[in-house]
UniProtKB/Swiss-Prot annotation:
Any GO CC annotation of this UniProt entry: host cell plasma membrane
Pfam families: Gag_MA, Gag_p12, Gag_p30
Cited InterPro entries: G_retro_matrix, G_retro_matrix_sf, Gag_p12, Gag_P30, Retrov_capsid_N, Retroviral_Gag-Pol_poly, Retrovr_matrix
Motif (PTAP/PSAP motif) on chain: 118-121
Organism expressing this protein natively: Feline sarcoma virus (strain McDonough)
Domain of life per record: Viruses
Record lineage: Viruses, Riboviria, Pararnavirae, Artverviricota, Revtraviricetes
Motif residue range(s): LYPX(n)L motif: 126-130
Protein name: Gag polyprotein
Residues linked to a lipid group, N-myristoyl glycine type: G2
UniProt cross-references to SUPFAM superfamilies, sorted A to Z: Retroviral matrix proteins, Retrovirus capsid protein, N-terminal core domain
Molecular function in Gene Ontology: RNA binding; structural constituent of virion
Gene coding for it: gag
Compositional bias segments (type: Basic and acidic residues): 417-434
Motif (PPXY motif): 157-160
Example of a GO biological process term: viral budding via host ESCRT complex
Amino acid sequence: MGQTVTTPPSLTLDHWSEVRTRAHNQGIEVRKKKWITLCEAEWVMMNVGWPREGTPPLDNTSQVEKRIFAPGPHGHPDQVPYITTWRSLATDPPSWVRPFLPPPKPPTPLPQPLSPQPSAPPTSSLYPVLPKTNPPKPPVLPPDPSSPLIDLLTEEPPPYPGGHGPPPSGLRTPAASPIASRLRERRENPAEESQALPLREGPNNRPQYWPFSASDLYNWKLHNPPFSQDPVALTNLIESILVTHQPTWDDCQQLLQALLTAEERQRVLLEARKQVPGEDGRPTQLPNVIDEAFPLTRPNWDFATPAGREHLRLYRQLLLAGLRGAARRPTNLAQVKQVVQGKEETPASFLERLKEAYRMYTPYDPEDPGQAASVILSFIYQSSPDIRNKLQRLEGLQGFTLSDLLKEAEKIYNKRETPEEREERLWQRQEERDKKRHKEMTKVLATVVTQNRNKDREE
């Protein structure tokens, strides 16, 4: 190999076509430049144990996943496809990845605490009591009576890969801890099992189904704004759920019912059905094709078959397209014009609010270069009066970009007087007036005194 050091990130670049194919099979897209940035910089700087070189243990991958899927503004929805693809490579490695996997394998002794379990019952009469802790299966999931597919959980919980030893030992209560609210992953055996997917490989290599829990839906609704208030944020959340959880048709309906209003659901479904592709790849208007690809009633799709999974993949893609289509609002520039800079608000904060208004009340993207002129005019004329007046007097204003105007506005803002400075200036001005008035009064008095003296002399 000479001086070349091969690391897992560099190895993925050497087999980039296979990495992209792996991502595409999961219905997601990844780009090489961002892949490099995340693997070698951003995930390292999260300080959760992601190494600059070498293969991260799966528990560290889970730590990165927690950061990415964190609710609200602390999450990174744009990184979901990349960590999902990395997780897939680590848990189901191709041949060119396996030589780099020995470091994660030492954690596999984690199932060893399970091995004393079968050998212990013959040695003590206390162990026959343990089976009584196995039958209580409610801890597998929080109660979720609304799911019509909950009866599928009567099968074994998702097995630990490799089908270790006696299956009953894998059913111990600690191993069946509740699914985490965002990833629904098991933390007891992170080195082998944490997939964060409801469709997992179960007994006899059959996919096993895990529905959303009530706590999942509650947390997603609680920690994210309504669709009517911020459609982009909620669309990003649902996209990350669709990518990582690979939900079934029933899951998708449950998700929409929990996160959207009835009117919003109707708009989303209508927009999604408009995007159903025909034989030529363009949106079709044939009702039978639309109903087959995006049915409004529960279809007979078996997620255990390749055909069923392909139907679900297309359905999820169309649902995401419907969310994006429903997020586009009719233009309401009057609402945009109501966003004006506050008296003490910084130009950067005002510009951020202005861009958010464009996203919320118009179908335009304020980051689009084609919309730069409109955003610039709004920024100038809706700034505070002192900043607006000085920006309007700039020479060559037509050649300024939005970044240039923001810098100029920051300069003007930073040169503003503080309340103390303004008070000092007004006090000095008043003092100068008083001095001037005093001098004038002195002159008048001096003139009067002089005139009186002259009269006295004449008399």
